[in-house]
Amino acid sequence: MKEVVYWSPKKVADWLLENAMPEYCEPLEHFTGQDLINLTQEDFKKPPLCRVSSDNGQRLLDMIETLKMEHHLEAHKNGHANGHLNIGVDIPTPDGSFSIKIKPNGMPNGYRKEMIKIPMPELERSQYPMEWGKTFLAFLYALSCFVLTTVMISVVHERVPPKEVQPPLPDTFFDHFNRVQWAFSICEINGMILVGLWLIQWLLLKYKSIISRRFFCIVGTLYLYRCITMYVTTLPVPGMHFNCSPKLFGDWEAQLRRIMKLIAGGGLSITGSHNMCGDYLYSGHTVMLTLTYLFIKEYSPRRLWWYHWICWLLSVVGIFCILLAHDHYTVDVVVAYYITTRLFWWYHTMANQQVLKEASQMNLLARVWWYRPFQYFEKNVQGIVPRSYHWPFPWPVVHLSRQVKYSRLVNDT
């Protein structure tokens, strides 16, 4: 391997990516190896490096010190001529004066044998700590939001006007496509397939704690938003085919049983647990179809393009079947897609950029209400989480062929 001082800018960029510091690739795109090892703390107090990381570049500087030691770079060389260092010695002469006699010091290449103190970087914690306690809190948050949603559906159901009094609102999609009775079952089957694929993929992920924590935070927030939108505006049923459950008129015991039945059935019509009306704005089915696809694509290798396309088709067909069944207004689906994709992209943009994890006047994303919980969940995650997989089960993997293809331990990102 070439010494660091001879590295090209491309080699420097590759080294940054290998060490999970992609945020430095753009500011250091023209840096050679010599420029890299010459970086000091002062460089991180000036633009553009001062805007990259919240730790003043300490992690990168520690990695550079480690790199110097790995390649035996000597930071404190004494610049002497080649060969043995000649030392001048005063020798008295017969006339009482002194002459200088040159003696070699016996050290090759003219270096003095001196003790050099090399700063050793402190042993830092893992860049991607699991922190299962935080993941459990995120799970409780998502579970609470899901339970609150079922309670809100039961409350809103009591306010939905009868379809004979308030007919369905006009909808452009309904004007062009007649209702297909079995379409909503296709939607829910696609959703269950996507959730199953995501669960299998999650089990094989190396950093499953971090990724599941992100999933719970996002899905919990989406269902919390849904509680608000369905409560503040109650829309009439989107079709005359709806047969809503009878209203209970304050019978809290019956409402509690209905809520428990809805939770046990996962809120799905295909399980017979969901026969209430009013939970239209916005579509929870669209949320799950969209969010599972986004997580599947984000945390799987780019080379599995066929897998991404299959999941995308399942998601798109499922969303189309929601409308084809006339079980949601078009605006319900549009709003659900918009909120889901934006929240997913905002969260991951903030999680992948260290500078966005620190509140400042320049960071406008720090003004969202969920920024403090975000900081708590993500503050110890350094950089982009690799798409790394491992076998989580005690029994070994069975190879179907004698020819084993070796690949990098870390999956392509």
Swiss-Prot record:
Modified residues (Phosphoserine): S8
Membrane topology label: Multi-pass membrane protein
GO MF, one example: kinase activity
Chain segments annotated as transmembrane: 136-156, 184-204, 215-235, 276-296, 304-324
One GO cellular component term noted in the UniProt record for this chain: membrane
GO biological process per UniProt: apoptotic process; ceramide biosynthetic process; regulation of intrinsic apoptotic signaling pathway; sphingolipid biosynthetic process; sphingomyelin biosynthetic process
Root EC class: transferase
E.C. no: 2.7.8.27
Pfam families documented for this protein: PAP2_C
Annotated control of activity: Inhibited by bacterial PC-phospholipase C inhibitor D609.
Subcellular localization: Golgi apparatus membrane
Catalysed reaction equations from the record: an N-acylsphing-4-enine + a 1,2-diacyl-sn-glycero-3-phosphocholine = a sphingomyelin + a 1,2-diacyl-sn-glycerol; an N-acylsphinganine + a 1,2-diacyl-sn-glycero-3-phosphocholine = an N-acylsphinganine-1-phosphocholine + a 1,2-diacyl-sn-glycerol; an N-acyl-(4R)-4-hydroxysphinganine + a 1,2-diacyl-sn-glycero-3-phosphocholine = an N-acyl-(4R)-4-hydroxysphinganine-phosphocholine + a 1,2-diacyl-sn-glycerol; 1-(9Z-octadecenoyl)-2-acyl-sn-3-glycerol + a sphingomyelin = a 1-(9Z-octadecenoyl)-2-acyl-sn-glycero-3-phosphocholine + an N-acylsphing-4-enine
Known pathway: Sphingolipid metabolism
Domain SAM: 7-70
Residues annotated as catalytic: H285, H328, D332
Listed InterPro entries: SAM, SAM/pointed_sf, Sphingomyelin_synth-like, Sphingomyelin_synth-like_dom
Domain of life, source organism: Eukaryota
Keywords in alphabetical order: Apoptosis, Golgi apparatus, Kinase, Lipid metabolism, Membrane, Phosphoprotein, Sphingolipid metabolism, Transferase, Transmembrane, Transmembrane helix
Tissue expression per record: Brain, heart, kidney, liver, muscle and stomach.
Note: Overexpression of the human protein in mouse causes increased non-HDL-sphingomyelin and non-HDL cholesterol levels, decreased HDL-sphingomyelin and HDL-cholesterol levels and increases the atherogenic potential of non-HDL lipoprotein particles.
PANTHER family from the UniProt entry: PHOSPHATIDYLCHOLINE:CERAMIDE CHOLINEPHOSPHOTRANSFERASE 1, SPHINGOMYELIN SYNTHETASE
Function, in words: Major sphingomyelin synthase at the Golgi apparatus. Catalyzes the reversible transfer of phosphocholine moiety in sphingomyelin biosynthesis: in the forward reaction transfers phosphocholine head group of phosphatidylcholine (PC) on to ceramide (CER) to form ceramide phosphocholine (sphingomyelin, SM) and diacylglycerol (DAG) as by-product, and in the reverse reaction transfers phosphocholine from SM to DAG to form PC and CER. The direction of the reaction depends on the levels of CER and DAG in Golgi membranes.
UniProt similarity note: Belongs to the sphingomyelin synthase family.
Protein name from the UniProt record: Phosphatidylcholine:ceramide cholinephosphotransferase 1
